[in-house]
Amino acid sequence: MSRSVSNAGTRLAGFGHRWLPFADAASADLSLGRLLRLSMFQLSTGMAIVLLTGTLNRVMVVELGQPASWVSLMLAIPLLMAPARALIGYRSDHHRSYLGWRRIPFLWSGTMMQFGGLAFMPFALILMTEPHSGPAFLGPTAAMASFLLTGLGMHVAQTAGLALATDLATEDTRPRVVALLYLMLLIGMIGSALIFAALLEDFGYVRLIQVIQSAA
């Protein structure tokens, strides 16, 4: 009886490695379930990319009437932070932690930066579009700060997450692990694009703020 159960388990494992996508990316120290949980940060990164470059890019120019030069500058700010990935990776490589977690503090910090930038963004949009008694540059400056915080959080979380995945993967499975992580990034971008399109089909100013707050 035990032999038949063992044979059934072996056949089931072989079926998984044969038919499940990226099942061969798993290893003894990094199971497929653990790898999928680790790759969740790529979904949020893909969502933030679509929200910044796909949704707010058009909405701020067409619907909110903001100058295209301001919007293009805001979108360029996260890209200008890309060279900081080298410093982030170096710091996470040499980070000393009493718990032995080198990457987790950076991954957590990047996620919190994304949350802070997206949570602050609705207030920045209100300052840009609604009349207020403050200086005129207050709204664009607040929007740039939220874009900067979100973009920096994306770079920090993605750099630390990819480094953590490559640390846990074996040398043989490392290429497939990285491929799975970038597949999750594409899934996050495609899924969030469809969701944002459905939610903003009947566009409204309040609806836009609700969508951004939900994304945060």
Task: Name each model-derived stretch.
Residues 2-216:
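Membrane-embedded alpha-helical bundles of multi-pass transporters/translocases
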